[in-house]
Design a protein with these regions (language model features):
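Channel- or pocket-lining gating/hinge segments that regulate access to a cavity or pore
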Residues: 157-286
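Soluble non-transmembrane domains of integral membrane proteins
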Residues: 1-160
């Protein structure tokens, strides 16, 4: 993946060309969602053979950057459906591409993934499935062609690749630091005490608590900004709720420590004084 909405794909596309096809048609294909520049798209005819019965076989090697909308709201438990749309070279000719299933060697194409190198590096994803289907595409124009019938519910061939994200990487990069921060917060909260000997032994003071909370908040904000930059075009993703909860936990520890030290009277002061701030410490994890 180049970024959250652009992925790189390379491969070979072939066509078997029957001699019975109209002479007005030419072999070739179009990837309508490709980003076509000198650096992002390559297409080269690498073989051309004549098969039995006069049928022609053409094969192209291609490299392309494809732009496609992706849903990241369930990150890191999300999955991706990459759709490689394929059109005939004369897309206005009302021709429909048909998958060449006979050229795949796997016996059960419904159960097995096909059409993709098993050694491919998927950058944090696992291959779940591949299959062909048709997209019923509609347009509000005939593009100037009087006999064009592809404007309404016209089938376009799509090669689909389903990817499942590897949760382990996301856990180590994003969730594990949050867990460490929460443990440090809880450890900081355990130092809140009214016992003079414990306060002296643990060097407890409200300034230390506020400084610790500020440092942990800064660490989380940096990680959160890096995550948001990664999914800048996406609405809030699932893992971001853990950051929001962590911000709340930081405020909770700082506010509790200040109130415990300064508000020794009243209902809140009495609740916090019970068993040396036991209620607030117990409520930390549910928060």
């Amino acid at each position: 993946f180049e970024n959250p909405v652009v992925f790189n794909v390379t491969g070979i596309i072939w066509q078997k060309w029957s001699p019975d096809l109209p002479a007005s048609l030419e072999p070739g294909f179009v990837l309508p969602e490709k980003i076509e520049t000198a650096d992002t798209y390559t297409e080269e005819l690498i073989y051309e053979e004549t098969l039995d019965g006069g049928e022609k076989l053409y094969g192209w090697y291609f490299e392309a950057h494809i732009r496609q909308s992706m849903d990241y709201t369930e990150f890191p438990f999300d999955h991706k459906k990459i759709e490689l749309r394929l059109l005939p070279k004369q897309w206005q000719s009302n021709a429909v591409l048909i998958p060449d299933f006979d050229s795949y060697l796997k016996k059960d194409l419904l159960a097995d993934s096909f059409g993709i190198d098993e050694r491919i590096i998927l950058d944090g994803y696992d291959l779940a499935d591949t299959y062909f289907d048709y997209l019923r595409q509609s347009y509000d124009t005939n593009f100037g062609f009087p006999n064009y019938v592809g404007a309404e519910e016209f089938p376009e061939l799509i090669f689909n690749i389903h990817l499942q994200r590897s949760v382990e990487n996301a856990f180590i990069i994003y969730l594990f630091p949050i867990i460490i921060v929460l443990l440090l917060l809880f450890g900081t909260m355990l130092t809140v005490t009214s016992d003079a000997q414990k306060r002296e032994r643990m060097d407890f003071n409200i300034s230390m608590i506020i400084a610790s909370c500020s440092a942990l908040f800064f660490i989380l904000v940096l990680a959160h900004v890096e995550l948001r930059d990664r999914f800048i075009t996406s609405p809030i993703v699932y893992i971001e709720y853990f950051y929001l909860l962590s911000y709340g936990a930081i405020f909770y520890v700082a506010a509790n420590s200040y109130i415990f030290c300064e508000a020794r009277s009243g209902m809140i002061g009495k609740l916090l004084a019970f068993e040396d701030n036991l209620l607030a410490k117990t409520a930390f994890w549910p928060s």
